[in-house]
Amino acid sequence: MKRLIPVALLTALLAGCAHDSPCVPVYDDQGRLVHTNTCMKGTTQDNWETAGAIAGGAAAVAGLTMGIIALSK
């Protein structure tokens, strides 16, 4: 049981961090790199979605931690 707790916390953390990167290199027809600064700033909607995902992940980790503490007492 003691080994399960860190594994569950790590899994929850990694699941919250899994997302596509906005920094995608652009290549031409011959396979040469065209743009190096393709990290576009997101829209306000993207920022709110990211903030919501972070808040949801933090709430999930907090709930999991509180549940573990409650069960261990």
Curated annotation (Swiss-Prot):
Protein name per UniProt: Uncharacterized protein YhdV
Domain of life: Bacteria
Major localization class: membrane
Record keywords, A-Z: Cell membrane, Membrane, Transmembrane, Transmembrane helix
Membrane topology: Multi-pass membrane protein
GO CC terms, sorted: plasma membrane
Cellular location(s): Cell membrane
PROSITE patterns listed in its UniProt record: PROKAR_LIPOPROTEIN
Regions crossing the membrane: 4-24, 51-71
